Amino acid sequence: MNPETTRFAPSPTGYLHLGHAYSALFAHDIAQKTGGQFLLRIEDIDITRCSDAFEAAIFEDLAWLGLSWETPVMRQNSRHPAYRAALDTLEGLGVLYPCFCTRREINAEIERAASAPHSDAPHSNGLIDYPGTCRKLSDGERQTRMASGVEHAMRLDAEKAAGLVGPLEFVERERGPIAVDQNQFGDAVLARKDIGTSYHLSVTVDDADQSVTLVTRGIDLFPVTHLHRVLQALLGLDVPEYYHHPMIEDSAGVRLAKRNDALSLRHFRDQ
């Protein structure tokens, strides 16, 4: 059995709950059993929602669980140069385009398309649906809007990306190779207007830079793995294997969330 490098990558936007404990213990145990490394990464790119207090609580909760991890701990907020370099590579490949749409405009367009005669609603895929409004703009229109200072995100042109990388697959432990399905993600945002990156870009770059060999995470993130595999191919990154574990639910069958304080690790620690 080869040594595995695994990671637990929480966001300091609330207290950890039992679902986080399961994920952390799951990744930690695999690393321990294989003589590998368990990494802790703080995913704090969204500085408006993250706090030092919640980050401190993460360390306290994981220590309370008896976990140890490699140091230093990577923090995404210090990694923006790496994300910018990745975006530059993607721009050079011609697979990014600026998106000037607001969320309200996107939702309105989706509703309009869904109600139009003889048209199908956009496919729901776990990422925000996007009707391709700004993909259809001319280069001149894009340049005019950008020059005038209109805020914009950067989206992946999924069709162009698929044409560049061709058929792909990733390995899901205990299931084997999975063919990448472009319909799982569409033209995803890779750089948000407010922070200049995204979860999808950052996590893909970070997993490669930290030489993670096995990404363990909840089954709710299985669809986005298709997008991450495309980004790996475009950026020439090493490809880890994946294991998407079941979600932890409460007695009513509802997925645990940070807003449920009664199931937070801090709640159990204080009892």
Identify the residue ranges that each predicted region occupies.
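Short linear Ser/Thr-Pro motifs
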Residues: S11, A257-R259
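C-terminal active-site "lid" helix and adjoining low-complexity regulatory extension at the edge
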Residues: Q271
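Active-site cores that bind ATP or allylic diphosphates and position pyrophosphate for catalysis
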Residues: E105-A257, S264-F268
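N-terminal Rossmann-like or analogous alpha/beta NTP/dinucleotide-binding catalytic cores
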Residues: M1-H118, I219-D220, V224-L237
